[in-house]
């Protein structure tokens, strides 16, 4: 499952669980985006924070794992590079790429789109009432699903934190605590940065 996960919320987790059940998946690998090419001018939380929040959120489900491949690759993240690397790591696996239906609608603009269909089956998930369309996409390469919990959005969660409103029950408890501890989404610099080991680096502070 690819995504910015800024922050990860219960909608992501329910969507992953529903897709896993429908397609009898053995494992769901969450792949936090390193540097999204579509959001190159948008302020997002540092990759280490997004990675750690994803680890925290998925820890209790033995079917869920988290991969750093997009974060560690460097440069802009393209789905084709993600899938090529996953294919190299798991050559015998049948890959399903889970993404938001809104992102899937833009897939024809993605890098090396013709190769994508040979690497994975794409599953577009959306909230009820959102128009789903697979126009222009190969019928045997794409599935669409509605997931009620996707009425939660990362954008709304960030806005609530910025306004001092609670995000309990919208995101997992451990993620709430991580956001609070590191003061994410309360300032342009998103609080404190983390190094590759998950250790805090002060940003604009004399001490902590």
UniProtKB/Swiss-Prot annotation:
Report the domain of life of the source organism: Bacteria
* SS bond partners: none
Choose any GO biological process term that the UniProt entry carries and state it.
NAD biosynthetic process
Which Pfam families does the UniProt entry name for this protein? Answer: CTP_transf_like
| The keyword NAD is annotated on this UniProt entry | yes
Residue spans crossing the bilayer = none
GO MF annotation list: ATP binding; nicotinate-nucleotide adenylyltransferase activity
Name the keywords, alphabetized: ATP-binding, NAD, Nucleotide-binding, Nucleotidyltransferase, Pyridine nucleotide biosynthesis, Transferase
What EC identifiers does the entry list?
2.7.7.18
Q: Which InterPro entries match?
A: Cyt_trans-like, NadD/NMNAT, Rossmann-like_a/b/a_fold
Q: In which pathway does it act?
A: Cofactor biosynthesis; NAD(+) biosynthesis; deamido-NAD(+) from nicotinate D-ribonucleotide: step 1/1
> What CDD domains does this protein's entry cite?
NMNAT
**Catalytically driven reaction(s):** nicotinate beta-D-ribonucleotide + ATP + H(+) = deamido-NAD(+) + diphosphate
Task: Give the UniProt family note.
Answer: Belongs to the NadD family.
What HAMAP family does the entry give? NaMN_adenylyltr
User: PANTHER family from the xrefs?
Assistant: NICOTINATE-NUCLEOTIDE ADENYLYLTRANSFERASE-RELATED, PHOSPHOPANTETHEINE ADENYLYLTRANSFERASE
Q: Which NCBIfam families match?
A: cyt_tran_rel, nicotinate (nicotinamide) nucleotide adenylyltransferase, PRK00071.1-3
Known role: Catalyzes the reversible adenylation of nicotinate mononucleotide (NaMN) to nicotinic acid adenine dinucleotide (NaAD).
Protein's recorded name: Probable nicotinate-nucleotide adenylyltransferase
Q: Which gene encodes it?
A: nadD
